[in-house]
Amino acid sequence: PSEFTLHEGVLKHGKMNIDLVYNRLTDFSLSEPASATLREAYLQNAIVLTPNPQAHALFADKRNLVLLSDPIRLQALGVPKATQDILLAAIPHTEIVLPENAERLWQKRRELFFKPFAGFGGRAAYRGDKLTKRVWQEIIAGGYIAQALVIPGSRVISDLEPAQVLKFDLRNYTYDDK
């Protein structure tokens, strides 16, 4: 992104005009200095940015999972019972890692998975039973959620001995309001 320029409302990379950017950076909020030109182009509606900062904040920030997995808060917000049932069945219990819950979470770590608020693709995500004390110190420094561990499913894909088994996971996505 630091190689982009914005000239008269047109984002450019060298001489090439850019009108769509598929954002695979980890700076989804475009707050880092290297993203300044990209941020300005987005704010001027000079480009389509996917995901854009608002979409990322609404749909990808893992802190939202804390609310979406809390039955008391969902009820207090007036979320319909049928919607609550779907959310609570699909989203493992999630909480923010804080200094005041760090000791309890460390004791329960084998039942948890730790993920950064805004990470993606498994970057800096840790299964609790594999944590070292060094990594735990990074996690409790801030910016992580703890989520109930869901063991990945598996399928036998061969009749050979030993059978070949592959793990899989299911993910929830949203696109175009669906």
Which functions belong to the PLM regions below?
Residues 1-178:
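Domain-scale recognition of functional cores that engage charged ligands
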